[in-house]
Amino acid sequence: METQTVQRELETLPTTKMAQTNPMPGSMGPWKITIYDQENFQGKRMEFTSSCPNVSERSFDNVRSLKVECGAWIGYEHTSFCGQQFILERGEYPRWDAWSGSNAYHIERLMSFRPICSANHKESKITIFEKENFIGRQWEICDDYPSLQAMGWFNNEVGSMKIQCGAWVCYQYPGYRGYQYILECDHHGGDYKHWREWGTHAQTSQIQSIRRIQQ
C-alpha cells in the first residue's frame, strides 16, 4: 500500500499539497528537503519528502538554494532525473556551487531530485572491475578513497562496477572532483556493467576517487 507524502508550499500564507508518490513502494524512509527559488534561502520555498521529476511543475524556474534536513538525495541538472548529478547530503546549500562544489563544471541548474533509499554509510560495499561486463582485475571496496591510484588501483579508469551494499558517489578526478556518478545497490540490481549506465551525463570511464554516501 502506497503511503501519502506531504509537500508543503511555505509562503506567507502556506498551503498543503498531498502526493501519492513514494521513493520506494512500502518504504517509510526519513527524507526531507526544502528548495528555494533564490540564493541564500530567500524567495519562494517548498518542502518535499519524495521525488520531484520537474520543479517547474511546482512553479519553480530553477532551484537556487536548498536545505537537506533528512536523508540523502540526488539533484539533477535537467528534468526527469537527467543530466549532471549532484550528491545532496544533510546540510545547507546556499548557492549552486555548494552542491556542484569542486565539480569543475559551471552548472547552475537543478531541475529534479529524488531521495537515495539505499544509502547506508556503515554497511557499504562496491566491487570495481578493470573492463566492461565485470571482466579483468577487480577490487572490493568498503571505505572512502580520495585517490584510487594512490591506494593501488592500476589506472584512472573503471570498466564496470557491482554495488553489493549501500550507495556510492564516484568522481572523475582525485580528491572528489569532476563529474559525479551516484551508484546504488537498488538500481540496475546493483550491476553497472558499462560506464554509460552511470548516468545520462556519463562521457568517460574515468573514475579516480570514490566514497560512501552519508544517510
From Swiss-Prot:
Positions of the UniProt region annotated as Connecting peptide: 118-123
Keywords tagged on the record: Acetylation, Eye lens protein, Glutathionylation, Methylation, Repeat
Residues annotated with S-glutathionyl cysteine modification: 82, 117
GO function terms (MF aspect): identical protein binding; structural constituent of eye lens
GO BP field: camera-type eye development; lens development in camera-type eye; negative regulation of cytokine production; negative regulation of ERK1 and ERK2 cascade; negative regulation of phosphatidylinositol 3-kinase/protein kinase B signal transduction; negative regulation of TOR signaling; phagocytosis; positive regulation of anoikis
Name the UniProt record assigns to this protein: Beta-crystallin A3
Post-translation changes: Specific cleavages in the N-terminal arm occur during lens maturation and give rise to several truncated forms. The initiator methionine for isoform A1 is removed. The new N-terminal amino acid is then N-acetylated.
S-methylcysteine modified-residue sites: 82, 117
